[in-house]
Amino acid sequence: HALAAFGHDRAGPGTPFVGIEAPVVPPPEDCPRFRDGPPAEVDWPVRPPFPFWAEVLDGRAALGHAPWDPEPRGAAENASWMRFDQPPHDGAGAFDELALLVVADMMPGSVFEVMPYRPDESSWFAPSIDLTVHLRSVPSGEWILTHNIAHWLEDGYASAECRIWDLHAEHGPQLCAWATQVMLFSERRR
């Protein structure tokens, strides 16, 4: 099931503000590409090409770890640069902001920051129970930054939020979308 509510710009009281800040991350060209996959010496159940990353999005890890990296981790947080290979456009030729729904549904990576992959253990997958996305603005350039933060993981469920940023907007970083997700965390046997 899907529920959508649409609105348009309108005048309102108060001074506009965004009460969160974009993370400070390296530029996309300095970040590892998801398309390249894990190094050959890493025991990872899937090898490139990964169809989604090879055919739809160029994703690059800007904050956090690659899923196959077994190193100890810190906060349940990650950020990734994303660029569509063929940017979706609406009928008028403008970037279709509904495409942001695709990148908003990548929050499980923030949970994996606190539960790293171990080749001798089961892997996990996390289908959505609830995904709510608030679209705010259309990105101005080809690269957008997703910043994901997990809030809790317990009893087979997890909750996270995603902030989608345009760091190259004319007047500084601009929040393009904000999303929340509750996911079912399940074990997948190898």
Question: Which residues are covered by each model-predicted region?
Answer:
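Terminal targeting signals and extreme-terminal segments of soluble enzymes
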Residues: 1-190
